[in-house]
């Protein structure tokens, strides 16, 4: 049954761990990372436009470039599945851009799932993953909604259980961190062989205070942008049991086990940081 409209939520992710290994011959980098979806999300309303042949994106609160992940997802899906109708997508952006939260990738994955449902094309998971990887390295992860250890350039995804009974605070320090720039600061050489420091699956189910997790980008980006380092320190000073920068920056997050502590921390941090979000992990 072809549907005329679908409402979608595109959740952000945080990286509980992110280790960048060598640079591959195809120009991408191998990573070992733990991705976890969180409650912060964009909202999308997708509608069929039978008299159109393209995707029109409407965003009342944010200017999106003509070439964006939503239109890219539509074009890739249309070419693969052979649909001929256009769509419109109205998006309410809540996930900051350039923040290491995967907002654009999550939007794209939600559109792929929505198109598969709207037009009843019945594409298999492997087909959706193949389309997703053409759009971006993080997009395949967002086709699911569970924590995962992600390897390679993002194509190897292993679902894992992460103890999710935490309260979270996310700070976006109003710095747009460009992923290519972050990788260039790391200076990984092509075909450089680096072995992972450890297997993150062994620690995902443990208390966050026992995690040995880290983010390879922190040292170089903290030097480049001291405000990111300060935001992380402010989370720890205000009682976070674990704090880390997400992705290639610039957002940082803190996990709290105690509800009273997180409420006090949130009120203090919100007064200092304009873009401060309370969240819950969606990792079970």
From Swiss-Prot:
Organism of derivation: Treponema denticola (strain ATCC 35405 / DSM 14222 / CIP 103919 / JCM 8153 / KCTC 15104)
GO molecular function: 4-(cytidine 5'-diphospho)-2-C-methyl-D-erythritol kinase activity; ATP binding
Lineage: superkingdom: Bacteria
Family affiliation: Belongs to the GHMP kinase family. IspE subfamily.
EC number: 2.7.1.148
Entry keyword set: ATP-binding, Isoprene biosynthesis, Kinase, Nucleotide-binding, Transferase
Active-site residues annotated for this sequence: 13, 138
Protein name, UniProt field: 4-diphosphocytidyl-2-C-methyl-D-erythritol kinase
One GO-annotated biological process of the protein: isopentenyl diphosphate biosynthetic process, methylerythritol 4-phosphate pathway
PANTHER family the record matches: 4-DIPHOSPHOCYTIDYL-2-C-METHYL-D-ERYTHRITOL KINASE, CHLOROPLASTIC (PTHR43527:SF2)
Purpose: Catalyzes the phosphorylation of the position 2 hydroxy group of 4-diphosphocytidyl-2C-methyl-D-erythritol.
The keyword Nucleotide-binding belongs to this UniProt entry's keyword annotation: yes
One Pfam short name: GHMP_kinases_N
Pathway entry: Isoprenoid biosynthesis; isopentenyl diphosphate biosynthesis via DXP pathway; isopentenyl diphosphate from 1-deoxy-D-xylulose 5-phosphate: step 3/6
Catalytic reaction list: 4-CDP-2-C-methyl-D-erythritol + ATP = 4-CDP-2-C-methyl-D-erythritol 2-phosphate + ADP + H(+)
Entry keyword Kinase: yes
Residues involved in ATP binding: 96-106
